[in-house]
Structures are given as C-alpha cells and as structure tokens.
Amino acid sequence: MDWSVFDFLVAALLLVLLFGAIGLIFVRRWSWLYRLGLALSLVTGALLFWVAGAVGLIGGAAHDANMAYPAMLTLGLIGSVVVRFKASGLALLLGGLGIAQLAIGLIAVLAGLGQDSQRWPDDILATSFIFSLLWLSAGFCFWRDWKTR
C-alpha cells in the first residue's frame, strides 16, 4: 500500500489526539477503572478507525462495507455524550458496540462480503472478535466502576 502525504497527516493527527486524550484522562481524579475504560475505548476506537480506513476489515479499504465501522464509531461518540460519560451508560454503550462489532463481521461473512481476501472468512471473524473483545473489556471496566461506587 502506498501512503500519500495526506495519509501520514491523518495518522499523525490521530496519534496526537489519541495520546493527548489519554494524557488528559490520567491527570483527572477519576477512579482507575474509569480511566482504564476510557483509555481502552479511545485506543480501540482509534485503532478501528485506522485499520478500517487504511486496509479495511472487510475486503480492501475501498470496500463499501467498511463504512459500517465509522458509522459505529460515530454512534458510540454520540451515545457517550447522550449518557454524559457516566460509567453506567458507558458500560451499556460499549457492550452494545462489542455486540455491533461482532454483528457487522457475521453479517459480512454471511453475505459473502470480502471474499476476494486470501484468508476469508477467518480475517473478518478474527478481527471482529478481537475488536469486540476490546469494546467489551472497556465496557467491563465501566461496569465494575459503576458497581463499586
């Protein structure tokens, strides 16, 4: 894959925003579970955005089905604002994102999307499982924070 200057600028901006946000998280006086949940969800979201945009999770990066991931991230961001970043709401929201991540992968495989990949369907199922596990882990951190208060 050949990267353009724009690709490098987007990647640099993504990393600066990610590390800046994580830095801000750890100077706040939230519980360590809440901070861990935020950091894990930010890293997962940034990684999903990067992978889906750069190489694509379903087929290649140009495959239209990959647009489900930015849509999912947008809903996650809107949902975070709606629940006002409360641990209880974030736990449910990230649980939903974990389920949505798996659902997107399963629907893609059942619909036969991305068959041009040499490792189809294992690549879609494995990445869906890994990202789902990351979302659910972040949600678990928020759930534990909510239950221990």
Predicted feature residues:
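Structural signature of hydrophobic alpha-helical transmembrane segments
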Residues: W3-L15, G60-M72, L125-F129
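Loop-to-transmembrane alpha-helix initiation sites
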Residues: Q115-L133
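Membrane-interface capping segments at transmembrane-helix boundaries
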Residues: V27-R28, G139-R149
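Cytoplasmic-side transmembrane-helix entry/capping segments in multi-pass membrane proteins
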Residues: S31-T44, H63-Y69, G89-I99
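Hydrophobic alpha-helical transmembrane segments in multi-pass integral membrane proteins
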Residues: F49-L57, I104-Q118
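A generic, lipid-embedded transmembrane alpha helix
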Residues: F19-G20, A39-V55
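Loop-to-helix transition at the N-terminal end of transmembrane alpha-helices
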Residues: M1-F19, W32-S41
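Alpha-helical transmembrane segments in multipass membrane proteins, preferentially the mid-helix core
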Residues: M72-K86, A108, A138
